[in-house]
């Protein structure tokens, strides 16, 4: 059955059906929650035009445990372990904010030795976090070696956690009034020796990634955040420093004894994924310097108490064996807990991911009336839509990696 292709007709007079204008719609896909690059239980509905992201809709709540509500029915000390389970990559930094809030409301002054130990372990937490963030972020864009190197150093830091408090991850080591117990005598030597070796590892990661052509193609000019964007979205931490704003609570609103330490605040210039990566690399070097200074200050500090003895903290064991009042205080402290005077306070620390804050409302009882947790990752994740819009699908994992998101704190 021959015909005339130009007239769209056949010899028998029949015509071809003309295809009407087809409506082309965008392609929707689910990114996660089982995706390895989602950094937890992130589910994102991505609307794609070809391979260009038109819309990214994050669905959170898959790890929601109702932490803030649970905290209202527990004593202040019982609430401490909940803080470990928020950003579980660097647990002690969250405990720090909780302890600071209670200490400000009760007017507790902690011993200097405890303050130095807190600074030391907060910086260990920062390195733990950045090693995880940088190396797994590199793996998301195709570099498989960095995690193998980074996790070796993380393992050594976890052992320092374990030697201080017995737990590798959920430490509950910072306590209202100080820290749970003093450090073993040889631990400071081992931490100092580790600090001497660590810059070599950062140099190796630097050599592997920083000037790597493929790595730069995947990160440069991806997920750009301007200074105005950072302020509008409530960014903190590396997200705001990568855009050129030198905002770090350790310097701008010093807590503990950070004002005694000498360290630099790395600041980016372009606000893209690459600058945020460079900031994290530089922060690891600075944290290492702070750790070395803390070790030297702890050596110079005479051995003394690491808890402010009073109503917030348990008595010494020797006192309990000698004194009935101390035994009663110990029993009451761990059954009823201590009472915090009525009032409200906001305490924030420069956690590795940004400003982690606790807004605590106390009503004079042994339990908090309300505790609001300000997680930095929550503010960062809510802007994933405009950050990834117009980028390729393959750029989304790179953006998520440099946002540095952990779902324990996002979902709470």
UniProtKB/Swiss-Prot annotation:
It is a peripheral membrane protein. It is found in: Cell inner membrane. The keyword Plastid does not apply. It comes from the Bacteria. Its EC number is 7.1.1.-. Keywords: Cell inner membrane, Cell membrane, Membrane, NAD, Quinone, Translocase, Transport, Ubiquinone. GO terms for cellular component: plasma membrane. Pfam families: Complex1_49kDa. It catalyses: a quinone + NADH + 5 H(+)(in) = a quinol + NAD(+) + 4 H(+)(out). NDH-1 is composed of at least 14 different subunits, Nqo1 to Nqo14. The complex has a L-shaped structure, with the hydrophobic arm (subunits Nqo7, Nqo8, Nqo10 to Nqo14) embedded in the inner membrane and the hydrophilic peripheral arm (subunits Nqo1 to Nqo6, Nqo9) protruding into the bacterial cytoplasm. The hydrophilic domain contains all the redox centers. NADH-quinone oxidoreductase forms a supercomplex with ubiquinol-cytochrome c reductase complex (complex III or cytochrome b-c1 complex) and cytochrome c oxidase (complex IV), which stabilizes the NADH-quinone oxidoreductase complex. Belongs to the complex I 49 kDa subunit family. This is NADH-quinone oxidoreductase subunit D. It comes from Paracoccus denitrificans (strain Pd 1222). The gene is nuoD.
């Amino acid at each position: 059955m021959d015909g005339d292709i130009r007239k769209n007709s056949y010899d028998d007079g029949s015509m071809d059906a003309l295809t009407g204008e087809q409506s082309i719609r965008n392609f929707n896909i689910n990114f996660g929650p089982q995706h390895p690059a989602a950094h937890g239980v992130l589910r994102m509905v991505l609307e794609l035009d070809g391979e260009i992201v038109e819309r990214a809709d994050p669905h959170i709540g898959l790890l929601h445990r109702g932490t803030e509500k649970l905290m209202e029915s527990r004593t202040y000390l019982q609430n401490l372990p909940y803080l470990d389970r928020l950003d579980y990559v660097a647990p002690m930094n969250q405990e720090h904010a909780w302890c600071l809030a209670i200490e400000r409301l009760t007017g507790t002054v902690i011993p200097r030795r405890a303050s130095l130990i807190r600074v030391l372990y907060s910086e260990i937490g920062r390195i733990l976090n950045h090693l995880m963030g940088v190396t797994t972020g590199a793996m998301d864009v195709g570099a498989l070696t960095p995690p193998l190197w980074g996790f070796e150093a993380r393992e050594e830091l976890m052992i320092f956690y374990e030697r201080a408090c017995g737990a590798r991850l959920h430490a509950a080591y910072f306590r209202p009034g100080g820290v749970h117990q003093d450090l073993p005598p040889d631990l400071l030597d081992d931490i100092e020796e580790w600090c001497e070796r660590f810059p070599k590892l950062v140099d190796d990661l630097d050599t592997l990634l920083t000037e790597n052509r493929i790595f730069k193609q995947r990160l440069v000019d991806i997920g750009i955040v301007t200074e105005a964007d950072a302020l509008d979205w409530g960014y903190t931490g590396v997200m705001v420093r990568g855009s050129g704003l030198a905002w770090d609570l350790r310097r701008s609103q010093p807590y503990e004894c950070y004002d005694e330490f000498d360290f630099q605040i790395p600041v980016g210039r372009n606000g893209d994924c690459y600058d945020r990566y460079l900031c994290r690399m530089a922060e690891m070097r600075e944290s290492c310097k702070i750790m070395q200074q803390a070790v030297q200050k702890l050596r110079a500090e005479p051995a003394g108490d690491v808890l402010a003895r009073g109503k917030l903290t348990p008595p010494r064991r020797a006192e309990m064996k000698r004194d009935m009042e101390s035994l009663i205080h110990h029993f009451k402290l761990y059954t009823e807990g201590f009472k915090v005077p009525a009032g409200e306070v906001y305490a924030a620390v420069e956690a590795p991911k940004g400003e982690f804050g606790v807004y605590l409302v106390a009503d004079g009882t042994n339990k908090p009336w309300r505790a609001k947790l300000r997680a930095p990752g929550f503010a960062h994740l809510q802007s994933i839509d405009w950050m990834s819009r117009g980028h390729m699908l393959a750029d989304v994992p790179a953006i998520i990696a440099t946002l540095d998101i952990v779902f324990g704190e996002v979902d709470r």
